C-alpha cells in the first residue's frame, strides 16, 4: 500500500460521530476523504468544510455532508497534508495552491492533524519552495519586495498560464538559499508586505503529525 494511503486512511480513524471536520487538499488528504466517504456510507454522521474546490467536488461525489465555515463557530478537527514538516511540527503547505483556505480552516479548528509520508519530514524547512499567495494587482512590485528578503522567486504557472487560486489570486514560489531557520519570523516579515495575502508557513498550528513510513505509522 502507498505510504500516503496508509497515513491518510489511518488519520480518518480520529474522526468520530457528530464531528465537524475540515477536509484538506492534496494527494494524501485524498485518501482520508475516500475513507471518510466509506465510513459515511456505513453510517458515520459528520459535517465537513472543504479547503478547496477540488476537495469540495470529491466530498460531494462521496456524499459527505458539507457545511460553510460561516455557519459554525469552530471545527473539531482538520486533517490535511503538508509539503514539508519539521520536528517542531512547523510546516510548508501550498504545493497544491490551496494554502489560504487551508490556513483559514486549520485556524478555525480545535485540532489539526497533518498527514505525510516519510519523504516530507525534514530537519529544516525550505528545500521545498515556499508558496506565497499574492493579489494580482501590481504583482511584480510585490514579488520584488519578497525577493528583497533574500529569496529567488518563480511565478507559478499551470499549462503555461499564470496559476490562479480558488480566491482569484496568484502564487509566487520562493527558494531561500540557506533554508528557513526561523519560520515564524519569516512569516511575520512576509505578511508585512502589502500585496501578500498569506504564506505557506504553518507555525504553532499542528496538534499531531501522522507519518506513513516503510515500517508503518509514526506519530509526532
UniProtKB/Swiss-Prot annotation:
Transmembrane segments: none annotated. One of its GO terms (biological process) is pentose-phosphate shunt, non-oxidative branch. Pfam families: Rib_5-P_isom_A (PF06026). The active site is at 102 (proton acceptor). It catalyses: aldehydo-D-ribose 5-phosphate = D-ribulose 5-phosphate. Belongs to the ribose 5-phosphate isomerase family. Substrate binds at residues 25-28, 80-83, 93-96, 120. Pathway: Carbohydrate degradation; pentose phosphate pathway; D-ribose 5-phosphate from D-ribulose 5-phosphate (non-oxidative stage): step 1/1. Catalyzes the reversible conversion of ribose-5-phosphate to ribulose 5-phosphate. This is Ribose-5-phosphate isomerase A. InterPro entries: NagB/RpiA_transferase-like, Ribose-5P_isomerase, Ribose5P_isomerase_typA_subgr, Ribose5P_isomerase_type_A. Its EC number is 5.3.1.6. Homodimer. It comes from Bacillus thuringiensis subsp. konkukian (strain 97-27). It is an enzyme of class 5 (isomerase). Keywords: Isomerase.
